[in-house]
């Protein structure tokens, strides 16, 4: 146990140094809180093992030598945390038990996510600015704080006498708008950008050259008074903040005086909703006993006041463990790894599953089954694994490998070189791809089965009548079942059966396109049909033969070959042909007049549709492209043609209007049908 405690102490010390001294946080606040509370729980369970250097009795790290060290007369302690309503009410019970028979009011403020500093004024003149440092000793950053525009260098008030000595505590931060502009400027200059506004504020404030700080959009928000001589005579926290505004200080844009802890909870929910619209970053709210005498009665623990706590928003990041990594198969056959997590509450929801996207991301993170990971979520953003903690990795942690076969249908998994995504090769057979495969197969440009829409498909899948696309051609055997589907009468069923029967007569190009082979669109399907002439020849083609086909590159050739190598796909193909799908036998190939030419259609066509123009061009051997290049043979331009027309003129590509195009097509025997 002591070894685990030492490990946590060292880890927290490392992150304390990064946060408090270097101003370069390496983990989120919630991740730090998790480590801190883990250590605190162990110390409460084993008090005899508490170490002298435990961070539970301190605030942060040591000051850097590049700034003069300053000892705080009144230590700058940190706050305890609560994370939910139950914790908040427990805080209130502890407060009220120590203040029996007293009315307690609570001052609620925004918990600003900035850099805590202390400001010293003598006779109203700013004489020193000091960072919190480790709570006992900070760094003198006076020259830099004097450059902050909204921070008063000399105090003025028409209502109050300026005290001889005043120590004000507050946060230096960078408003969101200023942060965005700073990062844009940094990027334009080719310099490093900042990860978040807090890092930007801290980095700016601790520059040795005050001119750099002066150029940064920093702001100071006061949140309390550490010392005042003579005493200001104020009795509440709320009045103290208003007094500071009279002296020229800016305070956070929302403060609430609450008469009960229930009202505090209501304000918490309100602030949480308003958070995205605030001009500054916050990570919760601060709840303080308002009465200053009651604060004195309550006193302090070793590192935090008993009279105040930070009520944190749901963590945007949290630590948990990876219990398992499963592979899901999407509608297009993509294999996606999903981490099954020990459930953790983060960003307002309980997260138990997180996508890892692909095998490359698994390798980049080096995430293994059994690892401790940071899960990040903010707003409506999908949760993600942001970091792996190798220092917590158990000896039995399992390395994750890409599966060789599909977890759904056992077809081979393929991942062409240079591709980030692995896919199941069982396109026609795989149950995970069934809906997408059927939807594509019946579409107008494929088998064109009119009436077999999504509603029909979903009903047929529920009834287990469609396991793959070949089952479509056996639906007539289940007529009575079809008639039992809601809103499917005799006429609808007969129309569907007739449309399925009519689709059996097709073309080889349409059939190839209908198979849904990755990378094979209409044009590629037509090129394959023209090149190989028969389905058997296409099935037997190797990668090298496929690569010789116009419009087929190296990767597409591999996808086609993999498709026809999968036994399950061949089984479905055989059933489709056995069901009666057929096309005219190929005739002796003749050279087409526009063979291999690239044409482009642009603008609004009025005498024909784009599909009609495309079909006529393809029938003559041309390829229709979406962009103009030096290889373009001709551009057909309709009304309101734009950039493509301009590019054609620049490259000297011939341009033809609709009327001339239709005349040319008629000369080749192609007319609008």
Curated annotation (Swiss-Prot):
The active site is at 111 (n6-amp-lysine intermediate). GO terms for biological process: DNA repair; DNA replication. It comes from the Bacteria. NAD(+) binds at residues 29-33, 78-79, 109, 132, 171, 288, 312. Keywords: DNA damage, DNA repair, DNA replication, Ligase, Magnesium, Manganese, Metal-binding, NAD, Zinc. HAMAP family: DNA_ligase_A (MF_01588). This is DNA ligase. It comes from Acinetobacter baumannii (strain ACICU). The lineage of its organism: Bacteria, Pseudomonadati, Pseudomonadota, Gammaproteobacteria, Moraxellales. The gene is ligA.
């Amino acid at each position: 146990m002591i070894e685990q405690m030492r490990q946590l102490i060292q880890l927290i010390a490392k992150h304390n140094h990064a946060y408090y001294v270097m101003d370069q946080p390496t983990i989120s606040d919630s991740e730090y809180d998790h480590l801190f509370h883990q250590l605190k729980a162990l110390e409460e369970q084993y008090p005899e093992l508490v170490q002298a250097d435990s961070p539970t009795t301190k605030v942060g790290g040591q000051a850097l030598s590049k700034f003069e060290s300053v000892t705080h007369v009144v230590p700058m302690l940190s706050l305890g945390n609560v994370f939910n309503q139950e914790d908040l009410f427990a805080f209130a019970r502890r407060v009220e038990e120590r203040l029996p028979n007293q009315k307690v009011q609570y001052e609620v403020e925004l918990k600003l996510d900035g850099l805590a500093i202390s400001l010293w004024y003598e006779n109203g003149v700013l004489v020193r600015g000091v960072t919190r440092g480790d709570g006992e000793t900070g760094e003198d950053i006076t020259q830099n704080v004097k450059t902050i525009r909204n921070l008063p260098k000399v105090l003025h008030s028409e209502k109050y006498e300026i005290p001889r000595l005043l120590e004000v505590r507050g946060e230096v931060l960078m408003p969101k708008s200023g942060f965005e502009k700073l990062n844009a400027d940094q990027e334009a200059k080719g310099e490093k950008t900042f990860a978040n506004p807090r890092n930007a504020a801290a980095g700016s404030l601790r520059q040795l050259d005050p001119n750099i700080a002066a150029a940064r959009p920093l702001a100071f928000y006061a949140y309390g008074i550490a010392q005042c001589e003579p005493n200001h005579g104020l009795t509440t926290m709320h009045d103290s903040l208003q007094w500071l505004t009279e002296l020229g200080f800016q305070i956070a844009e929302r403060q609430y005086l609450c008469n009960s802890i229930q009202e505090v909870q209501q304000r918490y929910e309100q602030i949480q909703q308003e958070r995205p619209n605030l001009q500054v970053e916050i990570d919760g709210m601060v709840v303080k006993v308002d009465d200053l005498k009651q604060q004195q009665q309550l006193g302090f623990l070793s590192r935090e006041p008993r009279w105040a706590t930070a009520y944190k928003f749901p963590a945007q990041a949290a630590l948990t463990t990876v219990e398992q990594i499963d592979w899901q198969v999407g509608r297009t056959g993509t294999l996606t790894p999903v981490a099954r997590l020990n459930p953790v509450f983060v960003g307002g929801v309980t997260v138990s599953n997180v996508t890892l996207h692909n095998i490359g991301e698994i390798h980049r993170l080096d995430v293994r089954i059994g690892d401790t990971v940071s899960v990040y979520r903010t707003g409506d953003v999908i949760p993600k694994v942001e970091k792996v903690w190798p220092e917590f990795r158990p000896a039995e942690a399992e390395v994750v490998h890409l599966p060789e076969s599909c977890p759904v249908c056992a077809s081979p998994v393929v991942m062409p070189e240079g591709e980030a995504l692995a896919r199941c090769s069982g396109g026609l057979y795989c149950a995970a791809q069934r809906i997408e495969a059927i939807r594509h197969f019946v579409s107008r440009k494929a088998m064109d089965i009119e009436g077999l829409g999504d509603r029909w498909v979903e009903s047929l899948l529920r009834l287990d009548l469609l396991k793959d696309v070949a089952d479509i051609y056996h639906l007539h055997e289940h007529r009575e079942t079809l008639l039992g589907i809601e809103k499917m009468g005799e006429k609808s069923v007969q129309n569907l059966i007739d449309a399925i029967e009519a689709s059996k007569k097709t073309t080889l190009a349409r059939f190839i396109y209908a198979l849904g082979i990755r990378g094979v669109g209409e044009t590629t399907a037509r090129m394959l049909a023209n090149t190989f002439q028969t389905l058997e020849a296409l099935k037997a083609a190797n990668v090298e033969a496929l690569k010789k086909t116009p419009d087929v590159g190296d990767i597409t050739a591999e996808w086609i070959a993999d498709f026809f190598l999968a036994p399950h796909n061949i089984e479905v193909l055989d059933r489709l042909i056995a069901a009666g799908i057929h096309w005219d036998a190929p005739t002796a190939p003749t050279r087409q007049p526009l063979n291999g030419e690239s044409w482009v259609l642009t603008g609004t066509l009025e005498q024909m549709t784009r599909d009609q123009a495309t079909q006529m061009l393809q029938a003559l051997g041309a390829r229709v492209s979406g962009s103009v290049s030096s290889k373009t043979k001709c551009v057909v331009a309709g009304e309101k043609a734009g950039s493509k027309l301009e590019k054609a003129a620049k490259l000297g590509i011939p341009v033809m209007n609709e009327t001339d195009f239709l005349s040319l097509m008629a000369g080749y025997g192609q007319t609008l049908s």
